[in-house]
Amino acid sequence: METLLKISGVDKSFPGVKALNNACLSVYAGRVMALMGENGAGKSTLMKVLTGIYSKDAGTIEYLNRSVNFNGPKASQEAGISIIHQELNLVGNLTIAENIFLGREFKTSWGAINWQKMHQEADKLLARLGVTHSSKQLCAELSIGEQQMVEIAKALSFESKVIIMDEPTDALTDTETEALFNVIRELKAENRGIVYISHRLKEIFQICDDVTVLRDGQFIGERVMAEITEDDLIEMMVGRRLDEQYPHLSQEKGECVLDVKHVSGSGIDDVSFKLHAGEIVGVSGLMGAGRTELGKLLYGALPKTAGKVRLKNQEIENRSPQDGLDNGIVYISEDRKGDGLVLGMSVKENMSLTSLDHFSQKGGIRHQAEKMAVDDFILMFNIKTPNRDQQVGLLSGGNQQKVAIARGLMTRPNVLILDEPTRGVDVGAKKEIYQLINEFKKEGLSILMISSDMPEVLGMSDRVLVMREGKISAEFSREEATQEKLLAAAIGK
């Protein structure tokens, strides 16, 4: 088995933090190496050391049997190591072809850009990924998933020996994901080495040959995928077995808090259900079924065209998110970076953003009270941040999600709507979020949990609503619900 890349004993420290401590990674020709670990385990730092963004404090990097130290991403890319970042890096007002070959445009013999050649080569790359768009289309006109495929095409254009994919399927549809997997299989057949970074265990077992696990910046081990189970992998990542991933809390539900009757509007068609105090109701369904639209409509982010909503026996009209907040309904978006958090602002500013009226007095803000409340939530939610003034964009996905939920709870709501509460969150942080949800439930909060993760819905919910084409197609008690029943109701069987 030919080793293309070998990272051994790498250390990296920042002021007050040892980010990497004896980190190791090997990449083999014709194989996919999963790089696993909780958020904050050191995966991104290791990749930045490899590509020359950070210098290492100790250790060695060998690429194609020679010692290397790249002075930046351009040098590593030119040497044949490409990285496809989780965050998109495209210019919206340029075409697909211009983005793929930016800075490397094909030239004619007289020095002008050879547009025909550039579009031909770009179209070949897109076809290889199953993308049907013309390479002349602007990137701004593409969906997030389609833009991600352009990023992958860009990396493939370098014909690299080693390709690092960081959460490559996060924004992809099932069809796009399968197209990507087909490309990965082709790359394996060409003897290229792939590093696949993902929190999605199902994908790891589906496409990867080997796995390397980091924990707290340390190398825990390298294993062959065929020789381990999901439980083995989780134990390597978090240092303990997660036999009970979904800690369901059994308790009697209280009074009816939210009563939705024949509500329609914005992709929702004649929806009725009740939500009680101290109850978690899961909302399941396929993509486009109307789950997110339901959450946003109840909150006031989308208009209601028919039906009635009663909160604690009082009819309410949420015509805006502010109305929703005023009426005690909080919606935590599935897109915490787009709709949820202001990444350039601090933890404190994000957390108190919708609750400043609680801290206002005679036209000013009681800053000490605000700081104390934020510190209480940081402690209660076990948010890993140096302090309340840390920029929220620098936190891990799990900690960002905790900040988003804390912001909602700070408004003291009656109803908490969680849309994909653990998307992009590692297995250890998921467990913490589930425990927090149970605490809210114990305190009598009414929770509507929208999720595409069926085990999550089944594991945490007291009842499950299944949506299809904007309607509720079925309702199941916790005891009745199974994955088979949920899927059958979602597809209309």
From Swiss-Prot:
Annotated compartments: Cell inner membrane
Top-level taxonomic group: Bacteria
Catalysis: reaction(s): D-ribose(out) + ATP + H2O = D-ribose(in) + ADP + phosphate + H(+)
An example molecular function term from Gene Ontology annotations: ATP binding
EC number: 7.5.2.7
Topology in the lipid bilayer: Peripheral membrane protein
InterPro entries noted in UniProt: AAA+_ATPase, ABC_carbohydrate_import_ATPase, ABC_transporter-like_ATP-bd, ABC_transporter-like_CS, P-loop_NTPase
Binding annotation for ATP: 37-44
Enzyme superclass (EC): translocase
Keyword annotations of the record: ATP-binding, Cell inner membrane, Cell membrane, Membrane, Nucleotide-binding, Repeat, Sugar transport, Translocase, Transport
Gene Ontology CC: one annotated term: plasma membrane
Quaternary assembly: The complex is composed of an ATP-binding protein (RbsA), two transmembrane proteins (RbsC) and a solute-binding protein (RbsB).
Family: Belongs to the ABC transporter superfamily. Ribose importer (TC 3.A.1.2.1) family.
Known role: Part of the ABC transporter complex RbsABC involved in ribose import. Responsible for energy coupling to the transport system.
NCBIfam families per UniProt: PRK10762.1
Name listed for the protein in its UniProt record: Ribose import ATP-binding protein RbsA
